[in-house]
Amino acid sequence: MSRGHKKITVLGAGVAGLVAAHELEELGHEVEVLEGSDRLGGRVHTHRFGEGGSVPFVELGAMRIPTKHRHTIDYIGKLGLTPKLKEFKTLFSDDGAYHTTSAGFVRVRDAAKVLVDEFRLLMSGRDLREETILFGAWLTAVGDAIAPADFRAALRTDFTADLLEVVDRIDLDPFLVGAARDQFDLHAFFAAHPEVRTSCTGKLNRFVDDILDETSPRLLRLEGGMDQLVDALVERIRGDIRTGHEVSAIDVREDHVAVTVHNGHGVNTLRSDHVLCTIPFSVLRNLRLTGLSTDKLEIIHDVKYWSATKVAFRCREPFWERDGINGGASFGGGRIRQTYYPPVEGDPTRGAVLLASYTMGDDADVLGGMPEAQRHEVVLDEVGRMHPELHEPGMVVEAVSRAWGEDRWSNGAGVTRWGKDVAACEEERDRAARPEGRLYFAGEHCSSTTAWIDGAVESALAAVRAIEAGDGR
């Protein structure tokens, strides 16, 4: 039961803003949503190659949901989308996919020998069991596939600490998998031995979460596109949702919040009783902000974002199936990093989509900083070395890409807290989410699960509770 009718302005129509708007309306409040861009959904961006329900599509933004992300799973259920949840096949899930090594591209099922040889060379001089070497080889392989450039060297440095010595004292036999027992089930291992996490030093400690999440066998997608989550929310919101309304200034006063908005017809300053800001801090820090505490301004400027760039090709056909790949992803290395093979949905005569390159961090900035045509050419050249079928006449019908680090509405793909311990992460979350008078905050940057949809939903629900309780300063 609401503690009284309130008029609330929500800034930003990403998942956090839309969830909050819907929840606030259900509590009886009057809500309007202002979005600077001409598109709803924020970093959920399903690109469709044409019009109609049967056209191929690709997720240029969020594309997967871990089953443990209960905020998202529960909300999908609330919106009636649970039947659409299907398995998301990721890196290392299809043993026919490729992995780049010093010996070139090898199938995942054949990669163990090369990976072990590479890791043994890295660990030369250390007396470790063969099973421990196998553990280290596969953890390094996953880290290489997922970690941005500035992180990969740190992974190897952390292996020189105590981690492998701890692992070397554990019975690893139950975690050897594959026909030749030359693959290692990292998920089962860390689940069975959580104490090993305390041996991870530096950046590796935080990154293990991402390693396990991004290669988890328990990842889901929305059949038909992730934008169905956005569409379902928009359909349920009764208040105005205005696109093309760009915020340039926020001024927090004792009894209201003044928001300066550019809407294409001029500049207006809106006076709102309560404002919920879901604008990423990477964008918010460039606005004119007054009336906020020194601590809030500091955290707005200090939160670190990482980039992500995706390049996709609509192909004449899913040629990778002829090559024995039935989904999942390959690690191509170089500038392309990860290549995904989404399921073919819709009319197969319209082709199939290859997510040719998914990069993060510094790797994403390299591709993201290129003109679009050059970016597509570079990716075609590098992925073509792994999949020469791409160079067949007429195989690539069209290309599309999104560089989130260059996107003026996000200035990054998500917040990173790698290298921070649990206490530091919680302190950052608390400072980011803390309201300033009648100005409240939500978004993945205000959550305990940054860079995921779950963080957006979690923070939106928390902000709604704070608005209801009147927790503003």
UniProtKB/Swiss-Prot annotation:
Residues that hold FAD according to the record: 15-16, 35-36, 43, 61-64, 444, 451-456
InterPro entries, per the entry: Amino_oxidase, FAD/NAD-bd_sf, Flavin_monoamine_oxidase
Signal peptide: 1-21
Catalytic class of the enzyme: oxidoreductase
GO annotation terms (biological process): amino acid catabolic process
Keyword Transcription regulation (UniProt): no
Record keywords, A-Z: FAD, Flavoprotein, Oxidoreductase, Signal
EC number: 1.4.3.23
Top-level taxon in the UniProt lineage: Bacteria
Cofactor(s) listed: FAD
GO molecular function: FAD binding; L-amino-acid oxidase activity; oxidoreductase activity, acting on the CH-NH2 group of donors, oxygen as acceptor
Catalysed conversion reaction: 7-chloro-L-tryptophan + O2 = 3-(7-chloroindol-3-yl)-2-iminopropanoate + H2O2; L-tryptophan + O2 = 2-iminio-3-(indol-3-yl)propanoate + H2O2
PANTHER family: AMINE OXIDASE, FLAVIN MONOAMINE OXIDASE
Subunit structure, interactors included: Homodimer.
Stated role: Involved in the biosynthesis of the indolocarbazole antitumor agent rebeccamycin. It generates the imine form of 7-chloroindole 3-pyruvate (7Cl-IPA) from 7-chloro-L-tryptophan (7Cl-Trp), with concomitant two-electron reduction of O(2) to H(2)O(2). The enzyme is also active with L-tryptophan as substrate.
Family stated for the protein in its record: Belongs to the flavin monoamine oxidase family. RebO subfamily.
Protein name: Flavin-dependent L-tryptophan oxidase RebO
Organism: Lentzea aerocolonigenes
